[in-house]
Regions:
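Compact, glycine-rich, soluble single-domain proteins
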Residues: 7-48, 52-57
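C-terminal structural segments of small proteins and small subunits
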Residues: 56-89
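Intrinsic-disorder/low-complexity, polar/charged segments enriched in Ser/Thr/Lys/Arg/Asp/Glu/Gln
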Residues: 1-5, 60
Length: 89
């Protein structure tokens, strides 16, 4: 199991369009992947789950992956959050 804390930097957070791209990226991996915020954990492959966290700019979330490609999954999702979501407003 691999975990990584990331801070949301894009202006709109993880909702609507950015969340859709996050879910698509999550679904490209075989590992089970979760997003944690405070005391809640949701499936990173579930749009409704991710949207229910109400993730906005400046929030810190934890990415958790467990499976055969867990390292690659965490690296790719952290990269997406850190560098690619601002273009998806």
């Amino acid at each position: 199991m691999v975990t990584r804390d990331v801070t949301i930097k894009n202006s709109v957070g993880l909702h609507a369009r950015p969340a859709t791209f996050f879910i698509q990226k999550s679904n490209s991996f075989k590992s089970s992947i979760w997003v944690e915020r405070e005391d809640r954990r949701v499936n990173a492959k579930s749009l409704l789950g991710v949207l229910s966290l109400g993730i906005v700019k400046g929030m810190e979330i934890t990415l958790v992956a467990d499976g055969p490609d867990e390292e690659a999954a965490i690296d790719a999702l952290a990269e997406l959050i850190d560098n690619e979501l601002d273009d998806l407003k």
